């Protein structure tokens, strides 16, 4: 399944530069690949490292943050040196390399386990429908709302900064800063999350960073340093919120099968909700011709996300 997902990423990314039709089809393939790999990630952590969920979730988030910061920070600059079509197709080499590494790991793993099979099966089947569990819906809501904030900010931050008088290249660097600033805490935050019984302190911290960050973005017209502060705080808050969401899928379940079930449901619902964010922001900007209303909308989403996160914290397990 992993090979198929990576293959979808490779093909989808490579073909989407040729026409509008290939763009739509390629984007669908990329979305399917990312969705399945995201569901797989917390399940693998829960199965392979049940006593080190925070550490390995941190490694996963760190890798995502590093690759995102490199892409966001240098895409605009590199596209001026080579065409954007070539740049996008060149990125397809990354999942190809990952496929090669996955094949090597699978071959190595088969050799080590050929003489010894696991003493117990993966885990008993989940008998209760995850769609009937309120906590699973709350987890999906938290996942979706934090993703909505992230994708909306990622999509519209450069235009917002340019509307504040910042040039395109600098806006690209600031977007890279937003991704890069979270790297030092990527390892730490999931370990903190997995080591405490209650998540309310972390959820309030994430909420506060979002609110101050969005407020600073409103002030970006008055000073360039407000823009820098906004990118730093929003980088921290989006990374911490994603770490919280991904770690909770493992912490709120007892077995890898439960994790897979909850993660699949939560991320399906969550990303469907998140997909509306950039579109709503674009619609609001077209309606009002300014970014203030968009930022107010994102602040409102932050409040709802905080409330949903506190609901998640009230129950210990989904099943």
Question: What are the roles of these predicted feature ranges?
Answer:
Residues 36-49, 240-254:
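Intracellular juxtamembrane helix-capping segments at the cytosolic ends
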Residues 132-186:
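Extracytoplasmic gate region of multi-pass secondary transporters
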Residues 26-62:
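Cytoplasmic helix-loop-helix junction between adjacent transmembrane helices
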Residues 1-14, 201-216:
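Structural signature of the two symmetry-related core transmembrane helices
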Residues 185-198:
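Helix-to-loop junctions at the C-terminal end of transmembrane segments
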Residues 110-139:
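Juxtamembrane intracellular "pre-TM" segments in multi-pass secondary transporters
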Residues 251-290, 298:
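A late C-terminal transmembrane helix in Major Facilitator Superfamily
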Residues 20, 51-110:
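Helix-loop-helix hairpin linking two adjacent transmembrane segments in secondary transporters
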């Amino acid at each position: 399944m992993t090979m198929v997902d990576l293959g979808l990423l490779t093909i989808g990314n490579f073909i989407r530069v040729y026409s509008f039709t290939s763009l739509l089809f390629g984007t669908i393939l990329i979305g399917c690949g990312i969705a399945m790999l995201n569901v797989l990630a917390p399940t693998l952590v829960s199965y392979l490292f049940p006593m080190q969920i925070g550490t390995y979730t941190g490694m996963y988030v760190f890798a995502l943050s590093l690759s995102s910061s490199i892409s966001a920070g240098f895409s605009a600059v590199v596209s001026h040196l080579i065409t954007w079509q070539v740049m996008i197709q060149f990125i397809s080499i990354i999942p190809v390399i990952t496929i090669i590494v996955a094949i090597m790991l699978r071959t190595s793993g088969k050799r080590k386990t050929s003489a010894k099979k696991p003493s117990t099966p993966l885990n008993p089947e989940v008998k209760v429908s995850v769609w009937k569990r309120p906590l699973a819906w709350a987890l999906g809501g938290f996942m979706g709302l934090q993703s909505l904030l992230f994708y909306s900010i990622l999509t519209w931050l450069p235009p917002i900064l340019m509307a504040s008088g910042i040039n395109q290249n600098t806006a690209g660097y600031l977007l890279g800063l937003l991704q890069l600033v979270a790297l030092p805490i990527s390892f730490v935050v999931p370990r903190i999350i997995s080591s405490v019984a209650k998540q309310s302190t972390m959820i309030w911290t994430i909420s506060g960073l979002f609110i101050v960050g969005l407020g600073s973005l409103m002030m970006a017209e008055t000073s360039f340093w407000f823009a820098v502060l906004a990118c730093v705080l929003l980088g921290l808050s989006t990374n911490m919120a994603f770490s919280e969401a991904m770690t909770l899928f493992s912490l709120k379940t007892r077995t890898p099968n439960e994790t897979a079930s909850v993660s699949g449901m939560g991320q399906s619902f969550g990303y469907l909700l998140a997909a509306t964010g950039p579109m709503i922001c674009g619609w609001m900007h077209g309606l009002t011709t300014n970014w203030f209303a968009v930022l107010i909308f994102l602040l409102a989403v932050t409040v709802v996300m905080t409330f949903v996160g506190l609901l998640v914290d009230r129950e210990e397990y989904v099943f």
